[in-house]
């Protein structure tokens, strides 16, 4: 009886959370794309059945190809993304989930001319590759934020979607990331840092090095996050960015979550921060954990200090 009641409470919590997020996105037409890993039919059906959501999900974009970890073949994923980006009837393109595969279709994206209409493009994790392309090649202000399938995850803070909805509906002129903790002395003594934002998932940022879509960091505020990263791997990837010269002209670095923030992970981040002559901060307000506040690429932003440090972005 107790187990049954617990199960009912879990189902009720999930239903309320999903309804709340769905309500904040009510009447917003959203084109869902799967440029990386896909989802099973139940996941797609559950998304379509969330009350108030207006999701455009094309079944042809989920025809499995040879590789089971991709939503479909490279050709199909590219075509579906291209069609969504160029369709002038919708304003929002939202990635289903991350996983793997976005980098595989960038060579074809590079052959395209920039569309006449700029759209909201949302996603994170593996989708970082597309953020770098769209912000650097087309000059778009894309949004690093929860993938649409995260609506079905009860462990996710549904406030992530409320904040995204406020941006999409034009209700806010700026968004903020609070609780920036300075990791080195330069950060502690900083009062103001100005710059546009770039970055995203550390693994994907590292993957971009040496490619046609390599991250451009000069004069930018760099934000980085990842998931389940063991300390030595984290140190190795950060060292790669440094030795590749990508941190030489960075205005500041903001680290998001990297898992459970074990003591060893924080030791790596603090040690790395001390090796740099730029401000470095840490927050748990974005990444693969419960809270994933939106961050806007390519927009005028600033790190300011009042009672605490915070990142303020224009919309």
Curated annotation (Swiss-Prot):
Superkingdom of origin organism: Bacteria
Keywords, sorted A to Z: Carboxypeptidase, Hydrolase, Protease, Serine protease
Record-stated family: Belongs to the peptidase S66 family.
Annotated InterPro entries: Carboxypeptidase_A_C_sf, Class_I_gatase-like, LdcA_N, Peptidase_S66_N, Peptidase_S66C, S66_fam
Signal peptide start and end residues: none
The protein, known as: Putative carboxypeptidase RC0549
Active site: 125 (nucleophile), 225 (charge relay system), 288 (charge relay system)
GO molecular function, one term: serine-type peptidase activity
E.C. designation(s): 3.4.16.-
Gene3D superfamilies: Class I glutamine amidotransferase-like, LD-carboxypeptidase A C-terminal domain-like
Nuclease found in the keyword field: no
Species of origin: Rickettsia conorii (strain ATCC VR-613 / Malish 7)
UniProt record, GO biological process: proteolysis
CDD domains reported for this sequence: Peptidase_S66
